[in-house]
Amino acid sequence: VESIIKDVKGDYIYPSFIDLYSDYGLPKAKKGEYNYRPQYESNKNGAFHWNESIHPEINSAEQFVYNNKQATNYINSGFGVVLSHKQDGISRGTAVLVSLSDQKEQKTVINDKAASCFSFKKGVSMQKYPSSLMGSIALLKQLFLDAYWYQNSNNTTNLSFNAFNNQFDLPHVFETSLVTDYNRIYQISDEFEIDFIIKGNGKEYQRIEEIKSYEYPIILPLNFPLNYEINNPEESDILILSKLKHWETAPFNPRILSENGLNFCFTMSDLEKPSDFIKNLRTSIEKGLTKKDALHALTLAPATLINEENRLGTLEKGKKANFIICSSDIFENGKIYENWTNGIQNIVNEKTENDVRGYYTFTSENVSKTFTIT
């Protein structure tokens, strides 16, 4: 294998980051045509589950296609690998672990079945049921019961149950929309003796003692609320205290999880602007998250959660060539020069040949001025 030697004296090098909650490279789910008659049965042909929001047979790897625009957003923020799944329905099927390199899919797919994914969201299904959170929970519990029963059944074939039963050895990722979803997931986890990795919602601080007791690993978004613009007294009356409290406390959420000993990693999911990721990450550090914990949450923690710590997450011989080169400490004001994914160079910011950054003092007679070039 040919090697490349580069002089990066004075630069900072980190392992490329890993995002465990993405829909990168996958088509968006689309709703069917509206029918004024209520739909109670599945319109999906084949020996599948009777409800369209239950589709564990979906294998995201079979639908994955490289997407340059999405990949660029991730690469510019320091990511090299993402776990991608089709974010639709309650039982969503398997996620694919992929490199963000601009290569054929045969080269970028790292693990075609890296996790199975769940939520309480019905998705684009046009069936009447479920029509509530309670219905979604009941349907998911029934799926577990039916799949267990199916293991000993010889008189029927159900491809959804087949797929579901084959996923028990995979990591299980469960999306939350509300902070109260943690308890709902725990009830399912406890009843069916299954562990979950929780995709969080940024409000974990509100019930930290309860969440701490569950000991779930958490995929944490950095979707901090923007500043509220209040131009007159009437607008201030509309703004409720809970929103102001969340605006103030949300940036402390990673620190609070860390101080309570919870295992977590970061995701770009839920950000309106992908470019805000590094900015919000630095805000978390300003609010008390240590740089060591931040780096762990971006690299080795996610790699370990999906059992890929032998190939990803650190800069070691034998691991994939995924790393970023930065001008200085990325957790302060470092600029990403290059992001190498799968051994392929991606230029993020051009590096000037003559680096003129620094402090300069200009003296003229009795006047002395100091300037900073960053």
Pin down the residues of each PLM region.
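Histidine-rich, glycine-flanked metal-binding segment
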Residues: V1-S16, K31
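Aromatic/His-enriched, Gly/Pro-containing loop or helix-boundary segments
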Residues: D7-K9, N35-K69
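His/Asp/Glu-enriched, well-ordered alpha-helical/loop segment
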Residues: R37-H49, E57, P171, P221-S328
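Polyanionic/metal-chelating signatures
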Residues: N67-Y205, I330, K335, T341
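C-terminal cap of metal-dependent C-N hydrolases
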Residues: K320-E353
